[in-house]
Amino acid sequence: MLEKFMRRRSVRTFSPEPVPLELIENAIRFAGSAPSGANQQPWRFVVVRDAELKRQIREAAEVEERENYEHRFPEEWKHALEPFATDWHKEYLEIAPYLIVVFRIDYGLEDGKKIKHYYVQESVGIATGFLIAALHEAGLATLVHTPNPMGFLTRILDRPVNERPFLLLPVGYPAKGVTVPAIEKKPLAEICIVR
């Protein structure tokens, strides 16, 4: 298992080849099994396959990303991104067969009353990690995309006020012949301390 997951890489070039919805649904079922604060499961996974919605998301994301690359990002951040040859153009948001938009549910709404959710950020982060692992296990590629600010996702996907975008995952098979930057993960000695 370790060997397989050490080969996982983010992909920005997807094949338009259809992906069975069942693979996506099973990955989300797995993500939904993640632990959460007080078992409140404060997440929503919105699966987008409609071409028009994907177009709207791409256009809105590119507006924010262009602003980020041209005005918001500090030079050192742009320099850190250079090995990945990324910029504000996000064609993959339309090419990937699916977009999974992960929302964090900051509080519950029951009979018009707010119900506090605990450890929302941590819980949604864990569930998203489960989701990425399940997608990889299913033979699918993905990329964590956070076009900040992300409020346009709430509007386009018609989500309620208590749900906030956490991140966006384009999902599909990698394009044939796609290459990814040669990167290394830190060795165990750098990430683990045993006392």
Language model: regions and residue ranges:
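C-terminal helix-cap and adjacent tail motif
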Residues: E3-V11, L167-R195
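Short catalytic-loop micro-motif centered on adjacent basic/acidic residues
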Residues: T13-F14, R44, A141-V144
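A glycine-rich helix N-cap at a beta->alpha junction
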Residues: R66-F73, D158-P181
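Glycine/small-residue-rich phosphate/adenosyl-binding loop
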Residues: V47-V124
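Short, basic and Ser/Thr-rich N-terminal targeting/leader segments
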Residues: N39-P42, T86, E94-A96, R164
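Glycine-rich phosphate/pyrophosphate-binding beta-alpha loops
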Residues: G32-N39
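Small-aliphatic-rich amphipathic alpha-helix that forms the alpha element of a beta-alpha
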Residues: A27-G32, I100, D106-I156
